[in-house]
């Protein structure tokens, strides 16, 4: 059985459709079914579902808000919630696929340069810091796991840069965007 956290988010939604196409058995949870910050609730869901594979897509992704008014929620979801998922994964003998972010790096590479998975992390934002701490909690808790660092996630579902630009193109004659950022878009499909 597969368990998905954050199943109504951009990546979780795409994952559900993909698993449906493959006729896989899964349980999809979102915050209304599973508060990942509540360790007892997490353990209860794991006991009921008995997953062998967990896609942990749930996250606090309001990067700008994480710097101030969302700081506590960012930590609770991205660190405490992820630690709860990792502990339950270990207890129940499942395999974890954790969705992290390129925000764990400092963004100092130039166009054309890429990061590798073994490079030193150096987050410059609160959001990035919580993702690094979450990765560390997973590494401390589990021997085997998959860690995926996405960048500029886009797809058919949810709000993202591509959908925002398409909406703006319908509403405005001229669109202005920043030109000092670069990244590697990750298709959610």
Regions from the language model: what does each represent?
Residues 1-21:
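N-terminal Rossmann NAD(P)H-binding glycine-rich loop of SDR-like oxidoreductase domains
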Residues 5, 29, 54-58, 96-101, ...:
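SDR active-site strand-loop-helix element
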Residues 20-44:
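Adenosine-cofactor binding site in Rossmann-like domains, unifying the SAM/SAH pocket
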Residues 39-77:
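NAD(P)H-binding glycine-rich loop region in Rossmannoid oxidoreductase-like domains
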Residues 54, 68-97:
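NAD(P)-cofactor binding segment of oxidoreductase domains
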Residues 64-72, 107-112, 158-159:
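Conserved catalytic-core motifs of eukaryotic protein kinase domains, centered on the activation segment
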Residues 76, 80-84, 104-148, 152-153:
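Catalytic helix-loop patch of NAD(P)-dependent Rossmann-fold dehydrogenases
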Residues 136-188:
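NAD(P)-dependent short-chain dehydrogenase/reductase
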